[in-house]
From Swiss-Prot:
NCBIfam families: asnS (TIGR00457), PRK03932.1 (NF003037). It comes from Clostridium botulinum (strain Hall / ATCC 3502 / NCTC 13319 / Type A). GO terms for biological process: asparaginyl-tRNA aminoacylation. It catalyses: tRNA(Asn) + L-asparagine + ATP = L-asparaginyl-tRNA(Asn) + AMP + diphosphate + H(+). This is Asparagine--tRNA ligase. InterPro entries: Aa-tRNA-synt_II, aa-tRNA-synth_II, aa-tRNA-synth_II/BPL/LPL, Asn-tRNA-ligase, Asp/Asn-tRNA-synth_IIb, NA-bd_OB-fold, NA-bd_OB_tRNA. Homodimer. It is found in: Cytoplasm.
């Protein structure tokens, strides 16, 4: 007999009713009495467990009643309806064999565990209800991202993980070397001699695939990347990780408004896809993680995102009369408390803030006619703050070079990026979406460490 997945039992219940099936999976709970036992089994294919009924007539009944949680089993039995129970069916076992025993000291017992504790056993936490739901949603959301862009003719491109350029110009990068740290070669000037290193020059882990993606956008028109990025920021907060995933589309012949339209459509598409394809997981989050989750997501999907300039945002915050921890004045980078006030108290929906001061944005963002601001925009959402940052890119070579000089960037490091402006340059735009940020928003999880399988944060690179 072929194996039947538990997902099939739930999605096609009538097809299996009163028929014999064979499943395999891991024991989640065992409840026994003198003549019966109830075993919940999860096979990994579905969020919910299946209840298996054991009768004392089974030859290994006593052994089965003593199974520790997480024992792997193979079950044969008849699917039968349960009209008065929470689950629509159960399996009356005719045979159960133990495939692999678990230990009685298995850490995930029936009691509820804190997310903090589960982070210490990241190799086991996917087996818990909460993280089973999180990582199923992560998989569906990743698929939805690809589906959105592929259906709109975008070309998926892979950008390098190891790079010699700093996209953000911030310098907070992880450096790579194969040199002996106890005997680092030096130049005559006493500086590190990178010519002796593996790549012959300094190399780092990428902070963004944007610059490389721009090269492909100027050949394929519309492209996107989706991969890991790394920031050596010593930010030990619930919203920052040292390794995370970024979605970065780049669009040729596109202005700032084209980016805004695309980003709004994409966010709504991904949320809708997850809501439709993970109803059980989303119901779990709405019940046990964030009781207002459905209302919040419905508001996002069904509202038109507000668009205001940075200057307008500053004026609104100053007029609010609220005493923020960080004082609001023109020229500062908006903090999370400012972003959340705009989205939660003033507009009560997602907000694009555009046209930021050039001094707080990256060198590649297009300078506006006022000479003080750039054609940049961040998407702010209720409950989280910023989840997307992007801009129209600076296509004018002379303006771009002047901007790099102002920021003391070495133009030789970006020679290939500058050269793009010489050969058929056009206006183009793009943005970056932190994948974990939108996962936090969709699931209601409040810590980035809980939406990525093995979080990497300052002082922690376990597993």
């Amino acid at each position: 007999m072929d194996i039947t997945l538990v997902k099939s039992l739930y999605r096609e219940t009538e097809k299996h009713m009163d028929k014999e099936v064979k499943i395999n999976g891991w024991v989640r709970t065992v409840r026994d009495s003198k003549n019966f036992a109830f075993v919940e089994v999860n096979d990994g294919s579905f969020f919910k467990n299946v209840q298996v009924i054991l009768e004392s007539s089974l030859e290994n009944f006593k052994e089965l009643c003593k199974m520790p949680i997480s024992t792997s089993v193979e079950v044969e039995g008849i699917v039968q309806p349960t009209p008065n129970a929470k689950q629509p069916f159960e399996i009356k076992a005719t045979r159960i064999s133990i495939e692999g025993k678990s230990s009685t000291d298995y850490p995930l017992q029936k009691k509820r565990h804190t997310f903090e504790y589960l982070r210490t056993i990241a190799h086991l936490r996917p087996r818990s209800n909460a993280f089973s739901a999180v990582f199923r949603v992560r998989s569906l959301a990743a698929y939805a991202v690809h589906k959105f862009f592929q259906e709109r003719g975008f070309v998926y491109t892979n950008t390098p993980i190891i790079t010699g350029s700093d996209c953000e110009g911030a310098g907070e990068m992880f450096q790579l070397t194969t040199m002996d740290l106890n005997n680092i070669p030096k130049t005559e000037e006493g500086k590190i001699d990178f010519s002796k290193d593996f790549f012959g020059s300094p190399a780092n882990l990428t902070v963004s695939g944007q610059l490389s993606a721009e090269t492909f956008a100027l050949a394929f028109r519309n492209v996107y990347t989706f991969g890991p990025t790394f920031r050596a920021e010593n930010s030990n907060t619930a919203r920052h990780a040292s390794e995370f995933w970024m979605i970065e589309p780049e669009m040729a012949f596109a202005e700032l408004t084209d980016y805004l339209d695309n980003a709004e459509d994409m966010v709504k598409f991904v949320i809708n896809y997850v809501m439709e394809n993970a109803p059980e997981e989303m119901a779990f989050f709405n019940s046990f993680v964030d009781k207002g989750l459905f209302d919040r997501l419905d508001n996002v999907v069904n509202s038109d995102f507000k668009r205001i300039t940075y200057t307008e945002a500053v004026e609104l915050l100053q007029k609010s009369g609220v005493k923020f921890d960080y004082e609001v004045e023109w020229g500062i980078d908006l903090q999370t408390e400012h972003e959340r006030y705009l989205t939660e108290q003033i507009f009560k929906k997602p907000v694009f803030v555009t046209d930021y001061p050039k001094d707080i944005k990256a060198f590649y963002m297009r300078l506006n006619d006022d000479g003080k601001t750039v054609a940049a925009a961040d998407l702010l959402v209720p409950g989280v703050g910023e989840i997307i940052g992007g801009s129209q890119r600076e296509e004018r070579l002379d303006v771009l070079e002047k901007r790099m000089e102002e920021l003391n960037l070495n133009k030789e490091d970006y020679w290939w990026y500058l050269e793009l402006r010489k050969y058929g340059e056009t206006k183009h735009s793009g943005y970056g979406l932190g994948f974990e940020r939108i996962l936090m928003y969709i699931t209601g999880m409040t810590n980035i460490r809980d939406v990525i399988p093995f979080p990497r944060t300052p002082g922690s690179a376990e597993f």
